[in-house]
From Swiss-Prot:
Role description: Catalyzes the transfer of the phosphoribosyl group of 5-phosphorylribose-1-pyrophosphate (PRPP) to anthranilate to yield N-(5'-phosphoribosyl)-anthranilate (PRA).
Protein name: Anthranilate phosphoribosyltransferase
Pathway of action: Amino-acid biosynthesis; L-tryptophan biosynthesis; L-tryptophan from chorismate: step 2/5
Name of a matching Pfam family: Glycos_transf_3
GO cellular-component term (any): cytosol
Gene for this chain: trpD
UniProt-annotated binding residues for 5-phospho-alpha-D-ribose 1-diphosphate: 86, 89-90, 94, 96-99, 114-122, 126
Assembly information from the UniProt record: Homodimer.
UniProt-annotated binding residues for anthranilate 2: R172
Species in which this protein is naturally found: Jannaschia sp. (strain CCS1)
InterPro entries: Anthranilate_Pribosyl_Tfrase, Glycosyl_Trfase_fam3, Glycosyl_Trfase_fam3_N_dom, Glycosyl_Trfase_fam3_N_dom_sf, Nuc_phospho_transferase
Sequence positions that bind Mg(2+) 2: D231, E232
Annotated anthranilate 1 binding sites: G86, N117
Lineage: Bacteria, Pseudomonadati, Pseudomonadota, Alphaproteobacteria, Rhodobacterales
Length: 345
């Protein structure tokens, strides 16, 4: 077979991975082979599990993310575009907080290039609820770009933009455990967004993910993990944050009261089916009060800090509140639905 010599190239890399962290160059070579379909299933599984067993390094995260970025179907986004996304996988089953936050932030005038997928840890992922909202998520780069232009926000469905991952998907499904691929979504925005509000399913991921985004050229980011276990800023308690700003990382803790918001019981943000979550989203856009609104206001305030619009959470909450109450966030949803409804690709 013509790919046998290239598969041979994986053997020393797998051995190195079992002994210690790979160099960035080694990891990039390995992930290129995997995404080209030139490594055998056993080799791909062996490498993934060797890395997982000892813990992934920042160089390995950065290498995998860079290879995915290089191979993705790219989207041209406005300057200052940001992504608001979580890793998923927290298993908490909440309402769609980051999705609603993205539209509130877009309604406030910050371009949002949102990268997402279907459900991972809940009954309703971003793509599931957006579909229920009348948005066609299975669109190509040109439609996403038009959506960004007309609505100030575009949704990039991960499988539409990362076709090379098809070679790895069967391996991931057979392994059935969390691997490096569970955190790559937020690191591989097809629009090359350089500002991120990113949630992680585990607290020990937020610092290395922040380091990775710095390595990949991000300008500003908040990496967050809520004390309630969510991959978002918690409305029910404190949230650990690693902030990337001016090329430096610093850790901080935020609390709803820092933003002038009340603490709500975690049960009040639990979600349901895509249809139920979409209805909660519609109600929020129409002015419904309560835990969901406050969670979105809090996350939007943080996103506005990352975007450089404000420096304090309380100021961000006021801008986010105006985005909802003025109807701007709702108009952003309607505009994306309009743009995407005329396309099937």
């Amino acid at each position: 077979m013509t790919d046998a010599p290239l598969s041979e190239a994986m053997k020393p890399i797998i051995f190195s991975a079992s002994e210690g962290p790979l160099s960035r160059a080694q990891a990039e070579e390995a992930f290129n082979l995997m995404f080209e379909g030139l490594a055998s299933p056993a080799q791909m599984g062996g490498l993934i599990m060797a890395i997982r067993a000892r813990g992934e390094s920042v160089a390995e995260y950065a290498a995998a993310a860079q290879v995915m970025r290089d191979r993705c179907v790219k989207v041209s986004a406005p300057d200052g575009a940001m992504d608001i996304v979580g890793t998923g996988g927290d298993g908490m089953g909440t309402l769609n907080i980051s999705t609603a936050t993205a539209f509130v932030v877009a309604g406030a005038g910050v371009p949002v290039a949102k990268h997402g997928n279907r459900n991972l840890s809940s009954k309703s992922g971003a793509a599931d609820v957006l579909t229920q909202m009348g948005i066609n998520v299975m669109v190509g780069a040109a439609v996403v770009e038009q959506s960004l232009k007309e609505a100030g926000i575009g949704f990039m469905m991960a499988p539409m933009h990362h076709p090379a991952v098809k070679h790895v998907m069967p391996i991931r499904q057979e392994l059935g455990c969390k691997t490096i691929f569970n955190i790559l979504g937020p690191l591989t925005n097809p629009a090359g967004a350089k500002r991120q509000l990113t949630g992680a399913f585990a607290i020990d991921l937020i610092y290395p993910m922040a380091e990775t985004l710095k390595e990949l050229g991000s300008e500003a980011a908040w990496l967050v993990h809520g004390s309630d276990g969510t991959d978002e800023i918690s409305i029910s308690g404190k949230t650990d944050v690693v902030e990337l700003k001016d090329g430096a990382l610093r850790s901080r803790v935020v609390h709803p009261e820092d933003a002038g918001l009340p603490v709500h019981p975690f049960r009040d943000i639990l979600g349901g089916t895509p249809d139920e979550n979409a209805q909660a989203f519609r109600d929020l856009l129409d002015g419904a009060q309560g835990a969901y609104r406050d969670a979105v206001l809090l996350n939007a305030a943080a996103a506005l800090i990352v975007a450089g619009r404000v420096t304090e959470l309380r100021d961000g909450v006021e801008i986010a509140r105006e985005s909802i109450d003025s109807g701007a966030a709702k108009r952003a949803v309607e505009a994306v639905a309009r743009v995407t409804s005329t396309s099937t690709a």
